Amino acid sequence: XRDGYLVDDXNCTFFCG
C-alpha cells in the first residue's frame, strides 16, 4: 500500500486505508 501501517505490499496486505 501506499498508506500501509504494517505491511506495504503494493496493494496493502494487512492494515491499509
Curated annotation (Swiss-Prot):
Keywords of this protein's UniProt record, alphabetized? Disulfide bond, Ion channel impairing toxin, Neurotoxin, Secreted, Toxin, Voltage-gated sodium channel impairing toxin
Provide the LCN-type CS-alpha/beta domain boundaries: 2-17
Give a brief account of the tissues where this protein occurs: Expressed by the venom gland.
Q: Which residues cross the membrane?
A: none
Where does the UniProt entry say this protein principally localizes?
A: secreted
Cellular component, GO, one term: extracellular region
> Which GO molecular function, any one, fits this protein according to its record?
toxin activity
Read off the domain note: Has the structural arrangement of an alpha-helix connected to antiparallel beta-sheets by disulfide bonds (CS-alpha/beta).
Q: Tell me, what does this protein do in biology?
A: Alpha toxins bind voltage-independently at site-3 of sodium channels (Nav) and inhibit the inactivation of the activated channels, thereby blocking neuronal transmission. The fraction to which this protein belongs exhibits low toxicity and induces transient paralysis in all insects tested (the crickets A.domesticus).
Name the chain's protein: Toxin Bl-2
Source species of the chain:
Buthacus leptochelys
